[in-house]
């Protein structure tokens, strides 16, 4: 422990593991520590016994649920956009060789008590029961504009400067109805609330393009992929990457106290009486609680079922977004389901999660609209956690703290945080312009 490191990373959550991998590849000397004796921190996957211990305090799940080891239940359930930032990061670092992915069957949106497949192209818009005949034509024109839009080709802009025009203005140009705007903004562009409407349209259009391009990657029913054996595989894969490039890992290290010099700069980490020196500290909010502030709360139901979610074409894996307006909420609700098809449960079992930003203190009542879509459940667990963002000035204390994972069921916001932290730590932007055709994600069924 007496050595000096460029960076000490505390916590083995996905964000911390991606960063330690990227920094190790950059040639920095990295020490990675965790107070837990397992990888993943808040973003780990639990077997059935661990799940019971965490939520029920006892170690004896019902026998009819099957073998404990066949369960890998994500604590932060998120799917991966097939053409998104996480896949680009996986390919950029060659971490794909440690993982096996499988396409996700379905992507749905909730409207007036029913769920519908999310249309993402002009062709799908014409077939979708989400819209009436005239609205389909308007939506088709909008989708064609988005598909043809190329930032570098002014001819495709139709006279609109998307860095100045708001999303609301571009939507009104096509005369789209409120319900259509709802599913485009929330189920395609994946915005969590309606703030995006008054922001420049460029991000909105890019997000829809990303969805459509991801959908086209696998010709499947959704734009998402997901690792076999659950998301707990991801932190471990990036940890292996870090180790290959000389990173040092230490699990089960008690306390992990960050040490500061007289000017308030981080200079090392002490655990069990030994101090390792460093120039910078990277960690999740739990390691430096005095340098973060609470900004909200995520509430989630974890459900074990013996059937797929009704009305999803018997999908073995599926995302359903319940837009805020449909529920009279301030932010969206998310439904995520996976099963034995991704090796996260025994044959015939499905794991479903209903997640939302908490707006009340009653998760059972608040998550009801999502839970009602599931049909009968074998077991249901509720949990909530506070969300934090850093408040420190990194240049002054050399501490780089990740934000807590949000309620969304996709990884885009997570990786934006990671790439932003990478830039602050290294002073450079990570170039992800890699050949995406090299992806090893297999679109099996």
From Swiss-Prot:
Report if keyword Transport is assigned: no
Task: Kindly state which keywords UniProt assigns to this record, in alphabetical order.
Answer: GTPase activation
Annotated GO biological process = protein transport; small GTPase-mediated signal transduction
Pfam families from the xrefs? GDI
The region annotated as signal peptide is none
Gene Ontology molecular function: any one: GTPase activator activity
A cellular-component GO term for this protein? apoplast
Q: Which domain of life is it from?
A: Eukaryota
What family name appears in the similarity comment?
Belongs to the Rab GDI family.
Function according to Swiss-Prot or TrEMBL: Regulates the GDP/GTP exchange reaction of most RAB proteins by inhibiting the dissociation of GDP from them, and the subsequent binding of GTP.
Database matches in PANTHER family: GUANOSINE NUCLEOTIDE DIPHOSPHATE DISSOCIATION INHIBITOR, RAB GDP-DISSOCIATION INHIBITOR
What is the protein's name according to its record?
A: Guanosine nucleotide diphosphate dissociation inhibitor At5g09550
Q: Which organism is it from?
A: Arabidopsis thaliana
Query: Which taxonomic lineage is given here?
Result: Eukaryota, Viridiplantae, Streptophyta, Embryophyta, Tracheophyta
